[in-house]
């Protein structure tokens, strides 16, 4: 008996609820589905709105490779496993099997912006679909440059942009994906030049957030600031922080994202070991947000937090994963992380690999998606 063929609209409606990683496995099932997943921007937009998000932690190894991390917080014994590295071929190499050496990675909307040390280009990559876009920097390249990725979240059709900036310079440039062109943004209100910016930036709904410190102040009068770059208006702004961040003196402050709608900040008071984790309400257009305290801890003296430490929070379970610092005299070949809960219990887990983070591993979160990249006049490559 032959089953009746379902209407196209019904098939698309069903597929729009299937997680992105499962759709990848279905790509070879039907040529029509493959075209739908690869080229249909309308379906991509609907799928982004309806399908359940899959949050995948990633780390960078000492070999400049990205590796997914499986974290199990269920049961009485948490566990962590670093999976095999993800391949990103370097099309500019004479060796067809050569990998692109990644020293920094920035996630936005299912895309990874990857840079390589002392390399005058960067790549924007969708690991799920295999699509890459390589951007040459040419004469504008210098070793102090950093890059972030975003889009105008007020537009139905996302137009992606990358911003380049130098931590030691006030000049910034925007790269437009749709036109494959650069332009200087010198008419925006920027944070004061005396701000030190932490290198850990996070994207949320197309905009980028990171912490800064007023360099004119000295301990114990340091005060942190949460900075936002809006890719729609192309302006910087300041976002309110929870009460512990608004007082003088602190030992550490670290930023992270929770899901795809909230920010989290970890703050350790300077005078005590008390450490608090705060979470925002859902981030909207306004720079004023409300914060709620999720955890309050008193870590042991040998458990150190400092600026820029990577951490991931499970708000529902009230548990977070944070990277263990390496002491100056430690010579461990492999890195470790702590799993920390509201019972003030710190569980030490081994990474099993040596990561690129120097004194501490770097962990970020990636959300697989079908999102497509504007490719006007650019170099595009798809790896299946």
Curated annotation (Swiss-Prot):
Coiled coil: none annotated. It comes from the Eukaryota. Residues 1-46 form the F-box domain. SUPFAM superfamilies: F-box domain, Galactose oxidase, central domain. Gene3D superfamilies: 1.20.1280.50. PANTHER family: BNACNNG10540D PROTEIN, F-BOX PROTEIN CPR30-LIKE. This is F-box protein At2g07140. It comes from Arabidopsis thaliana.
């Amino acid at each position: 008996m032959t089953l009746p063929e379902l209407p196209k609209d019904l098939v698309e409606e069903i597929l729009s609820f299937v997680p992105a990683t499962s759709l990848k496995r279905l790509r070879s099932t039907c040529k029509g589905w493959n075209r739908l997943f690869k080229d249909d921007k309308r379906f991509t937009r609907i799928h982004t709105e309806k399908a359940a998000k899959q949050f995948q932690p990633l780390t960078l190894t000492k070999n400049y490779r990205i590796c997914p991390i499986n974290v199990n917080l269920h049961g009485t014994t948490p566990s962590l496993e670093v999976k095999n590295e993800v391949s990103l071929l370097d099309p500019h190499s004479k060796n067809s099997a050569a990998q692109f050496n990644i020293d920094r990675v920035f996630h936005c909307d299912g895309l990874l912006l990857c840079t390589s040390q002392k390399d005058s280009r960067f790549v924007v990559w969708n690991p799920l679909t295999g699509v890459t876009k390589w951007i040459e920097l040419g004469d504008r390249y210098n070793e102090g440059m950093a890059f972030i990725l975003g889009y105008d979240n007020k537009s139905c059709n996302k137009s992606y942009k990358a911003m380049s900036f130098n931590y030691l310079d006030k000049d910034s440039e925007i790269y437009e994906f749709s036109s494959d062109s650069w332009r200087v943004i010198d008419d925006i209100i920027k944070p004061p030049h005396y701000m030190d910016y932490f290198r850990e930036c996070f994207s949320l709904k197309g905009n980028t957030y990171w912490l800064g410190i007023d360099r004119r102040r000295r301990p114990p009068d340091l005060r942190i600031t949460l900075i936002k770059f809006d890719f729609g208006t192309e302006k910087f702004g300041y976002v309110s922080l929870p009460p512990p961040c608004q007082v003088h003196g602190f030992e550490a402050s670290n930023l992270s994202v929770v899901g795809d709608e909230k920010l989290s900040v970890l703050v350790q008071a300077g005078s005590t070991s008390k450490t608090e984790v705060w979470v925002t309400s859902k981030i909207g257009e306004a720079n004023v947000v409300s914060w709620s305290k999720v955890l309050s801890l008193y870590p042991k003296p040998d458990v150190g937090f400092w600026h820029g430490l990577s951490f991931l929070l499970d708000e529902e379970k009230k548990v977070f994963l944070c990277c263990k610092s390496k002491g100056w005299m430690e010579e461990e070949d492999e890195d470790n992380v702590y799993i920390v809960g509201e019972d003030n219990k710190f569980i030490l887990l081994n990474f099993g690999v040596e990561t690129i983070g120097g004194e501490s591993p770097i962990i970020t979160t990636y959300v697989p998606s079908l999102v497509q990249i504007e490719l006007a006049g650019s170099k595009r490559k798809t790896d299946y």
